[in-house]
Amino acid sequence: MKILIPTAKEMNTDFPSIEAIPLKPESQAVLDALALYSASQLESFYKVSAEKAAEEFQNIQALKRQTAQHYPALKLFDGLMYRNIKRDKLTEAEQDYLENHVFITSALYGVVPVLSPMAPHRLDFLMKLKVAGKTLKSHWKAAYDETLKKEEVIFSLLSSEFETVFSKEIRAKMVTFKFMEDRGGQLKIHSTISKKARGAFLTALIENQVQTVGEARRLNFAGFVYREDLSQPQGLVFVKEV
């Protein structure tokens, strides 16, 4: 069983770095394509300020020169979902669960264990980077599928931009999750609810060592409970009354 989570734009490097590992050929090809951009070209590519673009340029060049600082991916990313994941004071069993079951899907690194070393970078599958004439999704599809082809159960906490990198055959094995709030009988869903709930849900999976869909249905976390009436066999819905 594998659990897939996305990367995040927000990052935190305020903790000790760890040793890097060599880039996969697919990752090196992406980096080579990114490294062709000047700082001013990155400004329009990323749709960010000149200051941000200059920072990203330095990050890319540091990776290219193999001088970039690397950090465990789970701690490097610091978006809303990540801030709601239990990342410290893990028991040995929780650490093992993380290492064996939780994987990050990255447009630069591929599908990798959640504690893998990553350097600060900015890239997602909505960005129009061409790698040897291919889109990022086309470039990564075979490698993404290869990582999961032997898995029977895949829990996806990904957005559609990441899920659609995988083939239909792999996506058919995915169990997806939706998190909603019940406000006086009105069911609401929005980005902030979803991101926080994904982090809390992953924490519950880790703490309860969940291995099956049945075990996931029984979870009660951060006020969310499973709603069978709203769910499908491979699309579970959790609702929080507020």
From Swiss-Prot:
Q: Which Cys pairs does UniProt list as disulfide-bonded?
A: none
Q: Which GO terms describe its cellular component?
A: cytosol
Instruction: Enumerate the Pfam families for this protein.
Output: H2O2_YaaD
Q: Name one GO biological process term.
A: response to hydroperoxide
Where does the signal peptide begin and end? none
PANTHER family, from UniProt? PEROXIDE STRESS RESISTANCE PROTEIN YAAA, PEROXIDE STRESS RESPONSE PROTEIN YAAA
In the record, the note on similarity to other proteins reads: Belongs to the UPF0246 family.
Protein name stated in the entry? UPF0246 protein SP_1547
Q: Which organism is it from?
A: Streptococcus pneumoniae serotype 4 (strain ATCC BAA-334 / TIGR4)
